[in-house]
């Protein structure tokens, strides 16, 4: 990969993965000398004002949340036509991949993971933020066995209408009934997905 620096600060190292809205890279923060993850909005969405607003909203929403079970967001920016979010770099595997590799979890582990996700959602809900896409792929299991909720990409502040467009966003197997009907969402929508 060609060396690229975003915002005059974040040196992209290698691609970690690609999702529905963005590609994630491991990067080096050249100011604070630490490894970070940088989510770069996919080019096909960069010209779409709604997606750009949603991307910025994710950064703002997640940056205001403080929990040991939520991935930390450090920065947001635009470099030319590239929108990016800088966040905590996590080592581990997403819950879905972990279950595929190692099989079903024992009930004690399920309870621990459920409790930690609930704690993360409680923090988000106290800030009136609804995740809207709780699913195993958005739960990172760390080497110590704890989890972090990731990808607030379609999260929305409960009182925000900035990106409300009556589109159904979320993953079919996990969305709440009210989400499929395009109705107003609340904390119970995330709990249903959990």
Predicted regions and their residues:
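Protein kinase glycine-rich loop
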Residues: 12-19, 24
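Conserved short submotifs of the Hanks-type protein kinase catalytic core
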Residues: 80-94, 98
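Conserved catalytic-loop aspartate of Hanks-type protein kinases
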Residues: 190
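Activation segment signature within eukaryotic-like protein kinase domains
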Residues: 113-114
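Activation-segment/catalytic-loop signature of the eukaryotic protein kinase fold
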Residues: 76
């Amino acid at each position: 990969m060609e060396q690229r620096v975003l915002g005059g600060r974040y040196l992209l190292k290698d691609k970690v993965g690609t999702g529905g809205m963005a590609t994630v890279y491991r990067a080096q923060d050249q100011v604070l000398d630490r490894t970070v993850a940088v989510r770069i909005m996919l080019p096909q969405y960069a010209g779409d004002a709604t997606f750009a607003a949603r991307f910025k909203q994710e950064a703002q929403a997640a940056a205001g949340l403080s929990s040991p079970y939520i991935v930390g967001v450090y920065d947001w920016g635009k470099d030319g036509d590239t929108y990016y979010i800088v966040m905590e770099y996590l080592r581990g595997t997403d819950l879905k991949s972990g279950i595929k590799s190692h099989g079903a979890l024992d009930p004690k582990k399920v309870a621990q993971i459920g409790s930690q996700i609930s704690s993360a959602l409680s923090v988000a809900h106290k800030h009136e933020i609804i995740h809207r896409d709780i699913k195993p792929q958005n739960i990172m299991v760390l080497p110590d066995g704890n989890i972090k909720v990731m990808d607030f990409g379609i999260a929305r502040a409960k009182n925000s209408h900035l990106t409300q467009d009556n589109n159904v966003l979320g993953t079919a197997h996990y969305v709440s009934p009210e989400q499929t009907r395009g109705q107003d969402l609340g904390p119970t929508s995330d709990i249903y997905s959990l």
